Amino acid sequence: MAELSLKKIYSGKVRDLYEIDDKRMLMVASDRLSAFDVILEDPIPRKGEILTQISNFWFKKLAHIMPNHFTGDTVYDVLPKEEADLVKNRAVVVKRLKPIKIESIVRGYLTGSGLKDYKQTGTICGLQLPQGLVEASKLPEPIFTPSSKEEVGDHDINISYAECERQIGKELAAQVRDAAIALYKEAAAYALTKGIIICDTKFEFGLDENGTLTLMDEVLTPDSSRFWSVDTYREGTNPPSFDKQFVRDWLEQSGWNKQPPAPKVPADVIQKTVDKYQEALDLLTK
């Protein structure tokens, strides 16, 4: 990643944040990939650029539902030209918001940790679901299944809606739930017209200086969502997805114990992953 003259204030699994002033920061998406909450050694070339383009597309498309973190500035407004040229496709100028300490997950279909919970209890995050659902079943309605936000390296934990209310307050919990479901419904309906099923996704929200709920971070990318192709979707199977699933599947069968460091991922698996990210961008935005 290019070194920037701005002061780095945070380095996450994928994104780095730089201070511009007390109201704004620069968010840069790297090519880092995390799987099972471990950051892998090998980057995925151009991944940060593709993710930024997908996110920007959705932020604009969903702006009528709620405010987002954009300030209206470009990277050229806040960086010297030679630095801006290096990061222009993977960086955005965003508001400094007070993040809400909950992962806002919406599920439209049953898979992953949700399916595990359902098999054991018939519920997800305490929500009762109909009997007889299987892998990849479409849920009667999209559901909001929050998880607690853990520090980088810790696994996030699914929590009930009541626990979400306890952590962030009743009023805010309802606002977050309703916003997340509205965003998911609109995005899922659009994606379906492009041949993509959005199985589930994670939104991040923050509060601005006036306390207004604001959409932030990344939106509906293959990193924060499971995208399935309409063509390969079959209920009862685990459909292939447009994301790091290639890498996750390879790691699963490599015998790795999911503790850092992760094993080196083969070049062909990395290339297939890049191709999947690019395909998602092309399908959604063309």
Swiss-Prot record:
Pathway linked to the protein: Purine metabolism; IMP biosynthesis via de novo pathway; 5-amino-1-(5-phospho-D-ribosyl)imidazole-4-carboxamide from 5-amino-1-(5-phospho-D-ribosyl)imidazole-4-carboxylate: step 1/2
PROSITE patterns linked to this entry: SAICAR_SYNTHETASE_1 (PS01057), SAICAR_SYNTHETASE_2 (PS01058)
Known EC number: 6.3.2.6
Leading EC class: ligase
InterPro entries for this protein: SAICAR_synt/ADE2_N, SAICAR_synth, SAICAR_synthetase_CS
Keyword Signal belongs to the record: no
Keywords of the record: ATP-binding, Ligase, Nucleotide-binding, Purine biosynthesis
GO cellular component, one term: cytoplasm
GO process terms (BP): 'de novo' IMP biosynthetic process
Pfam families: SAICAR_synt (PF01259)
Molecular function GO terms recorded: ATP binding; phosphoribosylaminoimidazolesuccinocarboxamide synthase activity
Reactions catalysed: 5-amino-1-(5-phospho-D-ribosyl)imidazole-4-carboxylate + L-aspartate + ATP = (2S)-2-[5-amino-1-(5-phospho-beta-D-ribosyl)imidazole-4-carboxamido]succinate + ADP + phosphate + 2 H(+)
Family of the protein in this entry: Belongs to the SAICAR synthetase family.
Name of protein: Phosphoribosylaminoimidazole-succinocarboxamide synthase
Lineage: Bacteria, Pseudomonadati, Pseudomonadota, Gammaproteobacteria, Pasteurellales
Designated gene of the protein: purC
